[in-house]
Amino acid sequence: MITTTPASLEVALYKAADVIRYAQNIAILTGAGVSAESGISTFRDKLTGLWQQYQAEYLVSIQAFEKEPALVWQWHQWWRGQIADKQPNPAHFALGEWQALAKQQGKTWTLFSQNVDNLHEQGGATVAKLHGDLGKNRCHDCAKPYDKAIAVTDTELKHCECGGLIRPDIVWFGEMLPQDAWQTAETAALNCDVLVSIGTSSVVYPAAGLIDLAKQQGATVIEINPNPTHTTAVDIVLPDNAGKILPLLVKALK
């Protein structure tokens, strides 16, 4: 981890603000670190309790659902229960405020996220969800949205009119990203003057490739992460929690 003094962090913060201030097109990528500050566990955290014998990576795979659909559905319902009471943190609210500020200034500002919760929306920001939305369901076979309300305590498998099983509308390992969300993110990365990567490990592809794409097009890349990734594409590192850095950054942009 990069060690910084308060003074050096302040210098990096204002350097980042200066770059962003003169940017017309701004792209934002968020990852699990942003949600972690609201108490939502990341996939790097070991499962506990009833689920400690399983690997999270297995439970979010298409292979697991096709082999053990009841198990996978039960785990996702448990996961939904875990995040149901979680609230946006200062990072989410700062992003919502930043989006409104950028609009006021006539700038293009695009947020795309690897997170499947709805904390960005609660914080006031519009977001393209690269890995889907845990709050929604769809048919595994025909992909038709399933709009009936399902309590997080309901662990019984549901079926679509076509006979297919209902599943969470998120991207599992082995699946393609949602086309609309990916197109939004890719277009933003191609056209941005600055890309800000927040709370992401920069190792989960294809989303992580958006950082390289922006860099190749000449964008400045800024990373906000308490554990910097040391990705070579990064120009400015702000090594602290998003909940601390983003409110300061947005304040500096006003």
Predicted stretch roles:
Residues 1-254:
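Conserved catalytic core of sirtuin-type NAD+-dependent deacylases
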